[in-house]
Amino acid sequence: NQVFVELIRQGYDTENTLFYYRSRNDKEVDFVTRKGVKVEKLIQVCYDLTSEKTRLREIDALIEVAGELKCQTLQIISYQHKETIEEKGFTIQVIPFMEWVNKPILVTPEIH
């Protein structure tokens, strides 16, 4: 999965900072990123959001897991679709993959 590879390239690792998550009600989120003990963001990957069934599945999973993990940064990485979704007090950014992958990475400088 290209999103997984990009997250690894950005410095996340599967031992400490990058996870898959399943909610208490079996809703799945593709990627949970962490900084220290704090959940940083939730990411769903969905090629096409035009099907209402798919759209609801992706949004419902993000919102449920956001509530469980107390996270406010929610993203859906899509093939081409871009929009901002406001749902149940949460804001979800839908970002085309090529736009997401080309965003600059903010690197915290090392202190010596």
Q: Language model features by range: what are they?
A:
Residues N1-H112:
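A cross-kingdom feature that marks ATP-driven nucleic-acid transaction machinery
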